[in-house]
Regions:
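Proline-aspartate-enriched helix->loop->beta-strand connector
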Residues: 58-62, 219, 351-352
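Glycine-rich beta-alpha loop elements in corrinoid/cobalamin-binding modules
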Residues: 2, 25, 34-151
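Radical SAM enzyme core and accessory elements
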Residues: 1-8, 28-35, 47, 51, ...
Length: 551
């Protein structure tokens, strides 16, 4: 039997692990022989071409991994395949597992939905597809005019490794994902992870072998998909120490390992290891969601916010890793005033990225299934974002969308950090007000960087010293790109600039870009031949004009 396992990734750079997990399960547990191949695509590609790529293989079974980012395109692909190929189509993944009956009722071209851990369930399904389907745990299927669902089975073993030779051929330098644990110790009302199987950890020696395989595959980033990497302190420490001890040896330098952690439960032992990790070897993503503990309690999230802040400040002080923190707008009980406070606290931690997301009511989460306890309105199409709550109006959420856009363009891009520092620390404008007010005054979509910088100057120039603002924006532009165009409003041409440029060129610094800081009687110089920092920008240096004897 010819079987194709497929997944539409959000971008080419992302290589989904799920189809390879299914293929590994078939190799390990099937009682029969199957011709299995993995076919990947992207949601931005030509869906008709992708469907015909699968059709041309003439499979008997096509399986799709379904998520909120690909379900629409996956269903479109499945419909095309069914119209042109005599095959059975089975869907799996979190986007269909919690509404299996609904999927079969709505989409006649889908034959089966499979829930639970696919490494075991999928080979069992293939072995029984022409026999007794009632033996297949987690399967939902049609029988005459009735839809039957078989309960899932709970597993405790380590699943087989998905990292086959074929996996590495297709990885081709993309982001590599690794799963070392399954489940989550928390039961947050907006998340599926805690609803899955109880938290269990995979064999540690196998994990170490897989880390080396992925690190030497040519990828630049190895991303751990464990929902709370530091749920087990001893185990997390052992993995971090393994990476540290092998970095620059079996693990090539420049490979970065990404972990999702709970910041408030970080212990001193883990912090000590993290402080000694090689520069750039680690990225940490910390989901705060909110700093309002009443809000966190309402969504069943336990967080010691005081300890969380303390630990993030420690992590930032190490200066050797990229720190990414998350906030969610639309949570139960959080109004605009509360969100603004959470935002300003989050911003004050000066992480390299402050991601501002919007609550999504996924199938299967408590917040979707218990509308009385968690009242809100949301979009019924993926990704199911909240459109209003009793605490946040639809207009306020739209306003926050523009705030998010400005946050990404000004701060998360790393492009305007000096300007933001000036506006917040010297002028005294609150961080939230900067992004919210400016974001809602300008449509940054498809706007060139130089035009965006000009809009920024024009918006804030009457709220502060316009000369200092001009200098800060100019310095920021020099730090972020070697080819950026400087808007005319920021330019001042005089002989001093020419003298300074000549000075650096004659001293062998031909890659240096400079700005004259008239407000300080100094020169800001950026050597763009050097590597960018953790904020993805070049470092600038300050020189005294008198010291360089340019006058």
């Amino acid at each position: 039997m010819k079987v194709i396992i497929s997944c539409l990734n959000s971008k080419f750079v992302h290589a989904s692990l799920s189809p390879w997990c299914l293929a590994a399960g078939v190799r390990e547990f099937s009682k029969k022989e199957y011709e299995v191949s993995v076919v990947e695509g992207t949601i931005n590609g030509d869906i008709e071409m992708f469907a015909h790529k699968i059709i041309n293989e003439k499979p008997q079974v096509v399986a799709f991994s379904c998520y909120i980012w690909n379900i629409t395109k996956t269903l479109e692909t499945a419909r095309l395949i069914k119209q042109n190929c005599d095959c059975k189509i089975v869907l799996g993944g979190p986007e269909v597992a919690y509404r299996a009956k609904d999927v079969l009722e709505r989409f006649e071209f889908i034959n089966f939905v499979l829930s639970g851990e696919g490494e075991w369930a999928f080979p069992d399904f293939l072995d029984n597809i022409n026999n007794d389907l009632s033996r297949v745990c987690g399967l939902t299927y049609r029988q005459n005019k009735e839809i039957i669902t078989i309960p899932e089975k709970e597993y405790t073993d380590t699943p087989p490794s998905p990292y086959s030779d074929e996996f590495f051929k297709q990885l081709n330098g993309r982001i590599a994902y690794i799963e070392t644990a399954r489940g989550c110790p928390y039961r947050c009302a907006f998340c599926l992870s805690g609803r899955c199987s109880p938290l269990r950890f995979f064999d540690l020696e196998r994990v170490k072998e897989d880390i080396i395989k992925l690190a030497t595959s040519g990828t630049k980033t190895v991303k751990f998909v464990d929902r709370t990497f530091n749920a087990n302190e001893k185990r997390a420490n052992e993995i971090l120490l393994f990476i540290k001890e092998n970095y620059g040896k079996e693990i090539p330098e420049k490979v970065c390992f990404h972990f999702e952690i709970a910041g408030d439960i970080l212990r001193e032992s883990t912090l000590e290891i993290l402080s000694s990790m090689p520069y750039g070897a680690v990225q940490l993503e910390i989901g705060m969601q909110s700093f309002n503990e009443d809000v966190l309690r309402k969504i069943n999230r336990k967080t010691n916010t005081k300890k969380l802040i303390e630990n993030i400040e420690k992590l930032m002080s190490f200066g050797n890793m990229h720190i990414h923190i998350d906030l969610i707008a639309g949570l139960t009980g959080e109004d605009l005033k509360s969100f603004k406070k959470s935002f300003n606290i989050g911003y004050s931690l000066k992480a390299h990225m402050l991601q501002m997301g919007f609550l999504k009511l996924l199938y299967g989460v408590d917040m979707r299934e218990n509308s009385e306890e968690y009242p809100c309105t949301f979009n019924t199409e993926p990704p199911y974002e909240v459109t209003s709550t009793p605490w946040l109006s639809s207009n306020e959420i739209k306003m926050l969308k523009s705030c998010e856009d400005a946050l990404d363009r000004l701060y998360n891009s790393g492009r305007f950090l000096l300007t933001l520092e000036y506006l917040t620390e010297k002028v005294g404008i609150s961080p939230f007000d900067i992004f919210n007010d400016f974001g809602n005054s300008v449509d940054g979509n498809k706007m060139r960087l130089c035009d965006y910088a000009e809009k920024l100057y024009n918006f804030f120039s009457d709220k502060c010293d316009k000369e200092i603002l001009r200098e800060k924006i100019l310095c920021d532009l020099l730090c972020c790109s070697s080819s950026v165009q400087i808007p005319d409003v920021l330019k001042i041409q005089d002989t001093l600039y020419k003298k300074a440029k000549k000075y650096f060129t004659e001293n062998g610094n031909k890659f240096v870009k400079i700005a004259i800081l008239y407000s300080e009687n100094k020169i800001f110089a950026v050597d763009q031949s050097k590597e960018k920092n953790l904020h993805n920008r070049y470092e600038g240096e300050i020189y005294s004009i008198d010291e360089l004897m340019l006058l």
